[in-house]
Design a protein with these regions (language model features):
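Conserved active-site tyrosine of GNAT-family acetyltransferases
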Residues: 156
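Conserved beta-strand-loop-alpha-helix junction that forms the acyl-donor binding cleft
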Residues: 86, 143-153
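Short alpha-helical segment within the catalytic ATP-binding CA
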Residues: 110, 123, 151
Length: 184
């Protein structure tokens, strides 16, 4: 996937030198140690960087994390990306004609807390959506979060996503789903 640029951001592939920053981002977003020790996170990150490069050589979809970097300072402030999602979308009203588990393209984002509230998540996610719809010709993009993650829900709304609530309590991270259809 090519590097994307917005007025304030650069969205680029991660490089090995980003490993320490990504480890801190994972701790900030999910809690210290949630993704293993520092060494385990480094090994996982090195694999992800190599896998992304390999998939690009094979012209595969650009799944995985991309660095969100501020243009004015070159500071890495977060991550955004696409992920294949095989989830129980059939539980949702607008997916009622599908089987319980369907494959969708998921969009995710995470920022260091000190960069919340400045519109960076919305700006980065909007750039990914534009790329996904115009270049990859995706039919639909989804995002998921917990009911109490009001910041992510606000980002979904700003992106124009239709929000649906999972009528069941499982899985816990699949409580609020943002859905955006490609209308082009």
């Amino acid at each position: 996937m090519r590097t994307l640029e917005t007025d304030r951001l650069i969205i680029r592939a991660f490089v090995l030198e980003d490993a320490g920053t990504v480890s801190r981002l994972l701790d900030a977003a999910f809690g210290a140690g949630a993704h293993g020790s520092a060494d385990e996170k480094r090994v996982m990150f090195e694999y992800a960087v190599a896998a992304d490069a390999g998939h690009a050589l094979l012209h595969q979809p650009p799944y995985g994390d991309r660095a969100i970097v501020k243009r004015d300072s070159n500071e890495l402030i977060g991550s955004v990306g696409f992920a294949p999602c095989l989830m129980p979308f059939g539980q949702l009203a607008s997916f009622e004609r599908t089987t319980r588990f369907t494959s969708e393209i998921g969009l995710f984002w995470a920022l260091f807390p000190e960069h919340w509230g400045h519109g960076y998540a919305t700006e980065a996610a909007a750039a990914m959506i534009a790329y996904g719809f115009s270049q990859l010709r995706l039919r639909r993009i989804v995002a998921t979060t917990e009911h109490d993650n009001t910041r992510s829900i606000k980002v979904m709304r700003r992106l124009g996503m239709r929000l649906e609530r999972n009528p069941t309590s499982e899985p816990e991270w699949f409580q609020t789903v943002g859905i955006l259809d490609n209308t082009e």
